[in-house]
Every structure is written in structure tokens, then in C-alpha cells.
């Protein structure tokens, strides 16, 4: 099944055949006809299409897509350019500036990170308009857990950045000692002062990659 268009299709072929995934596809196809669902249908698997399995150096986990009009663009924490920056993304940029002295961007599109090898993966891949977490029990987490497990199997070292309790739950899936796990509180305004600010995830990521002779990430938002 060619859903993504790169090596992820072969890696996830077994998941595509499972009943839970077939049920998601059936539900989603109907739901998009009946009511506003985000992200755009052709962007549901965009994080995977932009960052091939073999190119994944870093994984940043999000929850579910933004639920406002025109916001979600298939990448965790990212919004389309021209959309007001969500508070969590503003705080990510503040920490990036503090950590690597990268200027705070006015652009919200993180496609440039995805092309650098950062998989910006939401654990739930769709949401109803103005109803956060409305698709939480649809089965998406079975699929995204499988993605995390497949990355865990990689021989090449990978950095997993887990922000907030929902992301830290996934730590149990990351068992390969070659990988680095960076944890902190979520960049949301409600929790950013409880460990996110000052956690220096970006410099720690690049230090680890460099130590393993892997090209560092350019976190500049272009």
C-alpha cells in the first residue's frame, strides 16, 4: 500500500493490514465528508512523507493537530505561515533562542526542520474542528506507537524529545540504548516554567548527534 511514498510504506505495511488501521481509514473517509476535520486529508501522514525512515535523526512528539481553521499542516507544533503563532510554539522559539541564539522566527511552518531529519509526530493524527482530543480514542496511537517502535529499532542513534506527560508515557517504547531521550515539561504556557525553559533540548540534541558522527540539525526556521 503506497500511502506515504517513501520507505515508510514498506516499514508500516504490516500496520496497514491490521483491523484497527482499516477501521481508522473507513471512519476518516466518512468523517471528512460530514464535518470539518483537521489537518487536511492529504496532510495526515505528511510528517512521514517529509522525513523518510532512513533520514530520521530526531523525533519530537506532539499530541493531536491544532483544531482551528487553517492551522494544522501535518507536523507537530507547526502551523502554516501567516497563522498566528500558538503559545507553545512561541515558547519553543524562546527556548531555541536562549539555547542556540537562533533569532525568534515570526514563521510557524517547521517544514525546514522536517527536511533536516526531525520527525514532528503527533501521537493522534486528526481532530474535529474546535474539539481538541476528539479523535483520541480512534486508534491513531496504535499506529504512532508502531512508528516509535520502528524508529527504536534503528541502528543509527536517534534523539527522542519528549515534552509533557503525554509524551513521556511513550518512553517505555524507547528501549534501544543507542538512542538519547530528552525529557522536560511541555512548552505550553501552563507548564513551560516547570522545566521546559532552560532544558536546552536543541544544543543537547546536536551535541549527541555530533558525538555520534551524525550531521547536526540546523534549527533555524527558514
Predicted features along the sequence, with ranges:
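Short, conserved glycine- and acidic-residue-centered signature motifs
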Residues: 198
Amino acid at each position: 500500500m503506497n500511502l506515504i511514498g517513501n520507505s515508510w510504506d514498506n516499514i508500516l505495511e504490516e500496520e496497514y493490514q491490521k483491523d484497527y488501521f482499516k477501521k481508522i481509514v473507513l471512519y476518516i473517509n466518512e468523517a471528512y465528508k460530514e464535518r470539518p476535520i483537521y489537518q487536511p486529508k492529504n496532510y495526515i501522514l505528511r510528517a512521514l512523507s517529509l522525513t523518510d525512515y532512513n533520514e530520521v535523526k530526531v523525533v519530537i512528539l506532539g499530541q493531536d493537530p491544532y483544531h482551528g481553521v487553517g492551522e494544522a499542516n501535518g507536523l507537530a507544533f507547526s502551523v502554516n505561515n501567516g497563522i498566528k503563532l500558538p503559545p507553545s510554539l512561541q515558547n519553543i522559539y524562546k527556548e531555541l533562542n536562549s539555547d542556540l541564539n537562533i533569532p525568534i522566527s515570526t514563521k510557524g511552518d517547521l517544514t525546514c526542520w522536517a527536511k533536516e531529519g526531525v520527525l514532528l509526530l503527533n501521537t493522534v493524527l486528526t481532530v474535529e474542528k474546535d474539539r481538541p482530543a476528539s479523535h483520541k480514542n480512534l486508534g491513531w496511537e496504535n499506529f504512532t506507537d508502531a512508528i516509535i517502535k520502528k524508529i527504536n529499532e534503528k541502528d543509527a542513534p536517534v534523539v527522542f524529545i519528549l515534552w509533557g506527560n503525554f509524551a513521556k508515557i511513550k518512553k517505555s517504547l524507547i528501549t534501544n540504548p543507542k538512542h538519547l531521550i530528552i525529557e522536560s515539561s511541555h512548552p505550553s504556557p501552563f507548564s513551560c516554567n516547570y522545566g521546559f525553559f532552560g532544558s536546552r533540548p536543541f544544543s543537547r540534541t546536536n551535541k549527541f548527534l555530533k558525538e555520534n558522527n551524525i550531521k547536526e540539525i540546523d534549527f533555524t526556521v527558514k
